Amino acid sequence: MPKISVIVPIYNAEKYLERCVKSLIAQTFHDIEILLIDDGSTDASSMLCARLKKEDSRIRILHKPNGGLSSARNAGLLAASGAFIGFVDADDTVSPTFFETLLQKIEQYHCDFVFCDLIRIESGKPPTLRSASLHGGYYDKRKIKRCVFPQLIMRDDLEYGPLLSVCVCLYRTSFLKEHDLRFDETVRYSEDNLFSACAGYRAASFFYLKGQGLYEYHRNPGSITTTHKADAWESYKRMHQKLCALFQNCPEYDFSRQLDLHIIHYACAALGGVCALPKVEQKSKIDRILNDEALKRALQNRPVRHIPFKLAIQLLCMQYRCTPLMCLWLQRREHYA
């Protein structure tokens, strides 16, 4: 049985898949299984998986009908046999010491998960280190409640909390099983937000390797994060409803402010996507978002602090549902991301 199971969900990733898998094959820690989950790809990804498997016996392939990223990751969780589990997206890469470094920390501190920073790589721009809004080091339950719970879901400045991407993490398999932590397959975008909030809430301890950008996030043209998603708002609302069900009446901490900030954040994200639509379609899309009752309550209840001036203007337009002004504003501003 391998020490680490690495789950790689794949959908039409032929351009980048070999680069990703080669970075896994090159890991300095060798006792891993590489689970390639082909989520109904229609390009040459499945053939590429077969060729890569011939190069390394640690590769296992699972073909399934297309069900989305969460479905593919869940299939990987069911197939995984390692004591620890990691996730790597098919268009990303990891440094050679990624799993060796994370494993050393999770075993040293006997924690539920460990995570590091990522390097963002984008064509035409210098690589940038992305760090979490936490000090590095070991976090027990008391420290998690004090330092993480106040920003677990969303920060006051409308930025994500410190626990977001599952790809920078190594999880103890027994921890995931004990708390039945899986990905919600009804949430199609920002899947990590829901999973990571639950993991952070349930964890007895974790370790954060601050300043070590061992995961390499490649922002590729045409990826899911760079294109307009017509159903994004409905998916964001489903995620918000799931978070409310889990955290609205939490006995250990009052997450109500963060839940309001969460729907405001994703309304901004959905409105940013409206910029990509023809002008004739923008008004109806904006009206549908701004007239959402949960969003209206959140804008009334929770003044947002420490945000850029341009975003503050947008929030005022949203709060008073100034659709014509919102249309004009969206035509002039950069996408919120």
Enumerate the predicted regions with their spans.
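Cell-envelope/extracellular polymer assembly enzymes that use nucleotide-activated donors
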Residues: 2-5, 33, 194
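Short, well-formed alpha-helical segments that are part of the catalytic scaffolds
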Residues: 12-26
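A conserved acidic beta->alpha catalytic loop
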Residues: 23, 38-47, 65, 89
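Glycine-rich, basic loop-to-helix element that forms the pyrophosphate-binding segment
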Residues: 64-80
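Donor-binding/catalytic cores of nucleotide-activated saccharide
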Residues: 69, 90-231
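Short aromatic/hydrophobic "clamp" motif used to bind/position activated sugar donors
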Residues: 85
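Catalytic core of nucleotide-sugar-dependent glycosyltransferases
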Residues: 204, 211-220, 226-253, 266-269, ...
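Membrane-interface aromatic/basic loop that binds lipid-linked glycans or pyrophosphate carriers
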Residues: 245, 276-337
